[in-house]
Amino acid sequence: MYINETYAKKWAPVLDHPELPAISDPYKRAVTALVLENQERALQEEARSMQNLWEASPANAMGSTSPNGLAGAAGAPVAGFDPVLIGLVRRALPNLMAYDICGVQPMTGPTGLIFAMRSQYASNTAMTGEALYNEANTHYAGAAGANPLATLNANIANVTLANTGTGMTTAVAEDKTLEYMGFQIDRVAVTAKSRGLQAAYTLELAQDLKAIHGLDAETELTNILSTEILAEINREVVRTIYATANIGIVGLSTAQFNLSSSADTSGRWQVEKYKSLLFAVERAANKIAKDTRRGKGNMLIVSTDVASALSMTGLLDYNSALTNNTNLMVDDTGNTFAGLLFGRIKVFVDPYSVAGTDYAVVGYKGATPYDAGLFYCPYVPLQMVRAVDPTTYQPKVGFKTRYGLVANPFATAAGLGALANDTNYYYRRFQVLNINQ
């Protein structure tokens, strides 16, 4: 994402609003500023469309400058349209769980592209295999061994001088045709998808709600619709990670960790078995490092009972969730940050996990927004539409949002960024059985 400092300065009054939690992360500020800019552009286009429909506004039109609307200050970022939308974007966007469990790449248009470059072993006519990923093929640029190490998966038991490539002798080098290498560019298309909700209310309801409770019906419905849309996007991100994560701790055959099985754990006390669960998490994190060559797993999504089991081991530092609460961006919809495991793995509790079905999902997310297995790509977060029923003359309100969701091109073997079950190398999931025994 290209970070435009002009947007950050333009939206500074909104980003630094004193009544809202501060956005300390520079990238979150940049993403929020860009999405606010997209929101403003969408509202301006909507206003121009309305002007094309009517030569003059009717006398009873309700807009941002009407007595029933809210007006932005002249010259301010929200001038000329309802700031309720801007406020919702400012509150909602930084609290998305996606910032912590996947990458966030805002879109500036309805479609976008993600490019990835792969180094390749090649012939003079075609690519033959990816390079600079797993262990280097020692015979490729030198003299071939009898059984190249590349076919042995670096199994130390099978490594001998006979199957390790060496440099070429002068006689061989003077006459040998050198091997080819090259690169290919993978292109992944991201297309914005939409979500929308609507609500209707009567003028009588609005009048009574205002008179008795002092509440504005449109504002309350706006909050309900926007909160529901945000909650649905959050759950889509979480469930997509669950579905696309590779299965198992090491390999696809170990999809379960059984605390009552001697094959998985052995301990006299329950807390000793829980420490075996920690080792299972470490093995999954190590497997992610081998598959991605980016880093060990540093993020963990667990069910409630698994989080409690981890805390019983004494290695889940939940104090960080209290002392640094202002920086953790705990999701308002219920997904909570539990603390740090081993001082480096962020642990998130999924409050919607079904009782009796315990699991853990280990994932990796790098320091930059480009280093993740899944990308959430917001385009227009909230677009509000007001209407009046032509028969009853009762008001209606609707919301639509547009965003994309795509896998990292390097996250799957195909490299196409497709969201497919059990294929994403950046995440691994396994079920935890008999946690109460």
Annotate each predicted stretch with a short phrase:
Residues 123-142, 243-247, 410-426:
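Short linear, low-complexity motifs centered on an aromatic residue
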Residues 217-218, 233-256:
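Short, glycine/acidic-rich hinge or "gate" loops at secondary-structure transitions
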Residues 248-273:
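Acidic/histidine-rich catalytic neighborhood
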Residues 1-139:
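Extended assembly-interface regions of large multimeric machines
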Residues 82-83, 92, 98-100, 171-232, ...:
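Sequence/fold signature of self-assembling virion shell proteins
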Residues 70-78, 89-98, 107-236:
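Acidic/polar, low-complexity extended loops/arms that serve as protein-protein interfaces
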